[in-house]
């Protein structure tokens, strides 16, 4: 009886002029699978993820063209600073964008984020020197603060039974963007050299050899911006009064202890929310590893065999990463949701991290192969690493968004984005320095060459796995 009365209260307290209430009504009346909403969330996240790592397959050659590195072994050092500038910019603005999303809505932040890709990613492709590349990447990161708000949006636009799938779509699009982005960079960079029959050296793509992949992503971002202008706003623009259904439902609760928890959570700040903070810390460790791995993989694949690399071209790297993205898409859309329901997000994260360490341990051995054996092995390892890494991140997405109320999700995701961006800014810079150092110690007695690089990656990953255990990682009961 109480449940029926609660439903009536909820039905009567929709606000006619509130965009969030309209979305809630739409969710109640909707029947069937929300294909369009899933598609829009997916392409928005993909749009913001593509430029993050699209530069890595050609960054080695871009730094070489800038003539800033005195020796070949120093290219990785300078590449790390260009790679980290995006995340450094995002670290400075993520909390601000989260607060804007909670105050003015998710949609404005999403539109600004997609539009920033159109402008600054295009300018990056036209970079004339090292500092222009750093500044345009920094600006791109500063204005691209939509990942936190889009996670909140994904929780709010879907019914409860589809929220797990929604966050899986976010992490899938994010993971695929981080993989397909480099594939685009690999296939389209230096087009006058790779496809001389289509592009001449005298064309704009010959004068700016890294402009085409940036332009392709910017065109996609422009189309996504148009689509994003049609999405509904999910943030409620009214305040609850004492006679609103929220308080009525609170009085109807059969569990007085849950009321105390709700009051306590409402009064406490986000920084005192340990389930949120602990999941953010673990998320940061995995993010640092993920970004460092993304840069190291491309540098390792591009570097000469005499330094323990694969000697791959940008197109070769693009092929490997394209297969990785396809494998990740199949797994996330077909198997991840079952694994998450069966094991829970924490166990999925823990198992994924542990298996990823095994895969990474094989990378130095892969460099000893050649021909078809090398191609098959490195592609399989890349697919496995991508699936495991994205599965771990998805579990942490779910934990973060379940740890807070709707009106706190933008700020909570902003905090997560700031912390994650700082760690991801450290990742490429540290990875570039360590990779450059490893190339100079080929004859070392302990973990020579790239063996040291992958060992350090595994140490970071092991730390993330350890932090998923109690008492450190707490799971909310909401």
UniProtKB/Swiss-Prot annotation:
Subcellular location(s) per record: Cell membrane
Membrane topology: Multi-pass membrane protein
Gene inactivation effect: No visible phenotype when grown under normal conditions. No visible phenotype when grown in presence of zinc. Hypersensitivity to drought stress and auxin-related defects.
Induction context: By 2,4-D treatment.
Expressing tissues: Predominantly expressed in roots and stomatal guard cells. Detected in anther stamen filaments and shoot apical meristem. In the mature portion of roots, restricted to the cortex. At the root tip, highly expressed in both the cortical and epidermal cell layers of the apical meristem and the transition zone, while absent from the quiescent center or the columella cells. Not detected in lateral root primordia.
Gene Ontology terms, MF aspect: solute:potassium antiporter activity
Gene Ontology BP annotations: basipetal auxin transport; gravitropism; regulation of stomatal closure; response to water deprivation; root development
Keyword terms: Cell membrane, Membrane, Transmembrane, Transmembrane helix, Transport, Vacuole
InterPro entries: MFS, MFS_dom, MFS_trans_sf, Tet-R_TetA/multi-R_MdtG-like
Transmembrane segments: 43-63, 81-101, 108-128, 130-150, 169-189, 208-228, 280-300, 317-337, 346-367, 378-398, 415-435, 453-473
One GO term describing the cellular component: plant-type vacuole membrane
Function: Major facilitator superfamily (MFS) transporter probably involved in 2,4-dichlorophenoxyacetic acid (2,4-D) export. K(+) may be the physiological substrate of the transporter.
Extra information: Heterologous expression of ZIFL1 in yeast leads to increased resistance to 2,4-dichlorophenoxyacetic acid (2,4-D), indole-3-acetic acid (IAA), aluminum and thallium. Not involved in zinc stress resistance.
Family as reported in the entry's similarity comment: Belongs to the major facilitator superfamily.
Protein name: Protein ZINC INDUCED FACILITATOR-LIKE 1
Originating species: Arabidopsis thaliana (Mouse-ear cress)
